[in-house]
Amino acid sequence: MIFQLHPRLEQDCIAIGRFELCRLLMMNDSQYPWFVLVPERADMREIYQLSKTDRQLLTEESSYLAENLAILYQADKMNIAAIGNMVPQLHIHHIVRYQTDKAWPAPVWGKFDAVPYTEQQIADNLTRIKKQLKNVKPVPNLEPLTLLLTNQSTKNSVK
């Protein structure tokens, strides 16, 4: 089987790039710096289904991402979760949280309608994150701005 990004992740996220194992996405919700790692392995639903090598690599990539997001966005707390109740494809959320954000201290899911980024905000975020993450590579044949949400009323429902 060939890896294919779940349609819901494609709809709700903006492609940033990829690491050795994972595709890096940014959730199109400007209320929170919210990023998603998706291991580029076909038919994966759970972390334990990955090979031992891939599990270790996922841990490294997730830790690297979380640390750099915390630094870049001066996080009060990083929320990291692999839930997958709505989107069965294995994906790991990395959400920068602040004690002053709208949903604090509750989880962000389903609390408020998403507020999509403007094209300028997307460009600014892509520049910042790519500068911070030295080893993120482009996703072949994919322009980040082509994944802008067309449905501007999407809720924070990718879980």
Listing of model-derived features with the role each one plays in the protein:
Residues 1-90, 94-159:
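HIT superfamily nucleotide-processing domains
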